[in-house]
């Protein structure tokens, strides 16, 4: 998945398979292997993607929450306020709690539930965690185009919109709007892993 080549013109590089490495820079392997020291660096586009509707109107996804709220406001002022409130309520939680949990041994369900039940926000998260992405979006937003826009990102990643237990995932994808792209092409990730291994005495044969 980390293959880069000049598929059309010399010097114009194409990522043949993977382009966006959503979880690589946030994961522990990137830090523990110090991949940045081995040439693996990520660029963060301010505009991630867009959804184009049959009437040629569109919604563009921005990395900055303020710009994303302004984009949503073109369709629904209420939905823009909801989005802004979600960022205020859960943005920090995602960074300080949810992301570390993704890369840690799972807690016992009873322990996780007891921790979340201690706050109103946590109890709401438990409810959303059990729901489907469609149910969550229907609860939060009024504008169908806004719902479709956020749902499209989930389906592209391979998550079913009507699958129970993935409502929290929808919230994560709404609030964690990033699309890190490997500088110099996705193959730099493979090359960086090779260099990291060689720095510890390994011999890589291809």
Task: Tell me what each language-model feature is.
Residues 42-44, 148-150, 206:
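General beta-strand structural signal in soluble alpha/beta enzymes
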Residues 24, 132, 188:
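Short, conserved clusters of charged catalytic residues that mark active-site
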Residues 1-98:
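N-terminal glycine-rich phosphate/pyrophosphate-binding loop and immediately adjacent elements
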Residues 54-164:
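Rossmann-like flavin
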Residues 27, 135, 191:
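Active-site phosphate/pyrophosphate- and oxyanion-stabilizing loops and adjacent acidic/basic residues
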Residues 128, 169-206:
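Helical element adjacent to the flavin cofactor pocket in flavoenzyme catalytic cores
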Residues 8-13, 157-158, 177-180:
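A short glycine/serine-rich beta->alpha loop
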């Amino acid at each position: 998945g980390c293959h880069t080549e000049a598929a059309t013109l010399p010097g114009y590089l194409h990522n043949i398979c993977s382009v966006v490495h959503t979880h690589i820079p946030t994961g522990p392997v990137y830090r523990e292997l110090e991949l940045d020291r081995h040439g693996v660096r990520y660029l963060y586009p301010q505009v991630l993607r867009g959804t184009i509707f049959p009437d040629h109107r569109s919604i563009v996804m921005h990395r900055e929450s303020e710009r994303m709220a302004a984009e949503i406001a073109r369709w629904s002022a209420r939905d823009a306020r909801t989005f802004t409130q979600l960022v205020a309520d859960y943005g920090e939680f995602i960074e300080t709690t949810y992301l570390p949990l993704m890369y840690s041994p799972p807690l016992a369900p009873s322990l996780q539930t007891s921790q979340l039940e201690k706050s109103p926000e946590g109890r709401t998260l438990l409810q959303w965690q059990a729901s489907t992405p469609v149910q969550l979006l229907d609860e939060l937003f009024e504008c169908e185009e806004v719902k479709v826009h956020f749902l499209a990102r989930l389906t592209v990643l391979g998550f079913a919109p009507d699958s129970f237990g993935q409502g929290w995932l929808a919230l994560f994808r709404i609030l964690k709007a990033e699309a890190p792209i490997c500088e110099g092409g996705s193959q730099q990730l493979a090359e960086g892993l090779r260099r990291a291994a060689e720095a510890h005495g390994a011999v890589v044969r291809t």
